């Protein structure tokens, strides 16, 4: 099958690799422009762009696909997409808004021939439409997550559903581990669906149960110690690897990368124990932090971290 693929991060690269391995003809790839990365802030291509170039696939990296914002650039990309003569557009975490002309650029598959663009979305729609479905599911304490293959339309993840796959969210899942598990599941689901392209059908999303996964902000990283321990521990897991969770001790920002809720009571932010881990009181209960990080330093197990930065029982952190 001739496919145009649009995606940017590792989540999308997993699907692109699986499509290549399955023998599909990837005629063109869309990905976001190179971004500064690392300490040297060197321009770095996205995982999807690197994979495409490694496989000799042409890549387009427009700043926008909007004719209003960049009429010449967008029109040129629209023309290239239509001239690719693809059967299907596959989208996975691309990151740019796709206008209708892009959604209609492929010939289409499915029983009615009307599935021209299909999206790999990391949630069980209609729950967690939007930019950060994986992290928001963990943060909310959802028992399960999954991947939905969706026929794309202009609305924000509102398109009808082709198929889905589910997975439990474990007590140790982080945003990173769940994301990559869903990436594998979504890639498998897509490849299997494309084995019988003429049989694919879709159903509208349920009208009830709609929630939105807002984009993660750096400002959300700051821990509010008045919240329950269970909520804070979920945020630690959900916000790994981005934006992380942080508190301050003597004006030093400290990130927590692993923590579990435990019994304990005290003033919110009060240090309760420093033996083997850092236990801090919350609005209800306490969290025991087992992996922490200081600015400019690697993540460290709590015993080593507590040797490098001293905490006193009963002191209050912010």
Describe every region a protein language model picked out.
Residues 220, 226-318:
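An anion-binding loop in the catalytic cleft
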Residues 1-241, 294-296, 315-318:
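One-carbon transfer enzymes
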